[in-house]
């Protein structure tokens, strides 16, 4: 998700905690966390689950997400994988 120099992760933690708390408070958020990969220091992974596409869209448009992007936007982003778990086989 996000590649941060390991010596800068600690300064980013308060912003991560704020993003986590605000995202979890969204009505359409089922699960949300940001975590540093223990095997790769500086790699911040996001794990997010939303009720539906509208909830994901609302998250992306939220003020707290925009604030997180303003702080984290300076760091390179890795590829991401989106899974649609709403469809039944």
Briefly describe each language-model feature range.
Residues 1-3, 33-60:
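Short, well-ordered beta-strand segments in beta-rich or mixed alpha/beta enzyme
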Residues 1, 63, 88-89:
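Short flexible/disordered coil segments
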Residues 8-30, 64-68:
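Short amphipathic alpha-helical segments
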Residues 33-42, 68-89:
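Glycine-rich beta-strand-turn "strand-cap" elements at beta-sheet edges
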Residues 15, 35, 59-62, 71:
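Residue-level signal for well-ordered alpha-helical positions
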